[in-house]
Amino acid sequence: MAPKRQSAILPQPKKPRPAAAPKLEDKSASPGLPKGEKEQQEAIEHIDEVQNEIDRLNEQASEEILKVEQKYNKLRQPFFQKRSELIAKIPNFWVTTFVNHPQVSALLGEEDEEALHYLTRVEVTEFEDIKSGYRIDFYFDENPYFENKVLSKEFHLNESGDPSSKSTEIKWKSGKDLTKRSSQTQNKASRKRQHEEPESFFTWFTDHSDAGADELGEVIKDDIWPNPLQYYLVPDMDDEEGEAEDDDDDDEEEEGLEDIDEEGDEDEGEEDDDEDEGEEGEEDEGEDD
């Protein structure tokens, strides 16, 4: 199985550098300044100069890495398109992939899974300069839940480094809003102290509270999108558990048969001992006569 593609290190918003250590100008001008203190001040100034060179090289490296990533991002596009065309031939590919992913499956309720059975295509598009953000598109067939054919969510990073997001408004059909139903279900469950289902997967499209820490978006972009096949092919855990239980049952049956055989051997041994004792008794009676 092909390894997951690791995203290149992209330029991060510049963080203000800590203020340089105060120079001991007044003391250095004094002829009576201790030698050790003067050497320490000179070392601090030289460290600051070297650090400036390191920062300059880091910025240069980030720019070059970004250019390489932009180049290969364009080269990958035809292959992503070809992969999408092939995936379209496999029914329920994306819902299976999401259900098999441990982090995404934790966000899926039963009705979410039903709705995702109509999901036919997923696309992740990084903006041309890459560092400013990306968009995730979900394409759906006609379904009983909402009118939209495409649901999208975009993530942006402005020049100051502040993240933000925006998404498609979901046009729910009458009585089919899974986000409201999820909230009602959780309220009932909490009152009855029953197991609470996770918040609906579709609330992700309306949640813009912390775009900089959107785990689902990052999982889809960095983990699932580079190689969704690895999650589609994950063995069904229920099947594995069933096979394990069958193996345990077979082992128990074999152990039971072995116990029966051992008990049978012991019984036969006891019968042989009884027969030997009987024969010895008859011989003793004959000698007495």
Swiss-Prot record:
InterPro entries in UniProt: NAP-like_sf, NAP_family
Modification N6-acetyllysine occurs at: 23, 67, 149, 171
Main subcellular localisation: cytoplasm
Biased composition, class Acidic residues, residue ranges: 236-289
Site of covalent link Glycyl lysine isopeptide (Lys-Gly) (interchain with G-Cter in ubiquitin): 153
Domain of life: Eukaryota
Modified positions (N,N,N-trimethylalanine) in chain numbering: 2
Residues with the Phosphoserine modification: 7, 28, 62
Composition bias type Basic and acidic residues, residue spans: 35-45, 168-180
BP-aspect Gene Ontology terms: negative regulation of DNA-templated transcription; negative regulation of neuron apoptotic process; nucleosome assembly
Keyword Phosphoprotein in record: yes
Residue numbers carrying Phosphotyrosine: 145
Region feature (Dimerization): 31-77
Subcellular localization, as worded in the UniProt entry: Cytoplasm, Cytosol; Endoplasmic reticulum; Nucleus, Nucleoplasm
GO cellular component: cytoplasm; cytosol; endoplasmic reticulum; lipid droplet; nucleoplasm; nucleus; perinuclear region of cytoplasm; protein-containing complex
PTM remark: Some glutamate residues are glycylated by TTLL8. This modification occurs exclusively on glutamate residues and results in a glycine chain on the gamma-carboxyl group.
Region (Disordered): 1-45, 157-206, 235-289
Family from the record: Belongs to the nucleosome assembly protein (NAP) family.
Function: Multitasking protein, involved in apoptosis, transcription, nucleosome assembly and histone chaperoning. Isoform 2 anti-apoptotic activity is mediated by inhibition of the GZMA-activated DNase, NME1. In the course of cytotoxic T-lymphocyte (CTL)-induced apoptosis, GZMA cleaves SET, disrupting its binding to NME1 and releasing NME1 inhibition. Isoform 1 and isoform 2 are potent inhibitors of protein phosphatase 2A.
Domain comment as written in the entry: A long alpha helix in the N-terminus mediates dimerization, while the earmuff domain is responsible for core histone and dsDNA binding. The C-terminal acidic domain mediates the inhibition of histone acetyltransferases and is required for the DNA replication stimulatory activity.
Protein name (database record): Protein SET
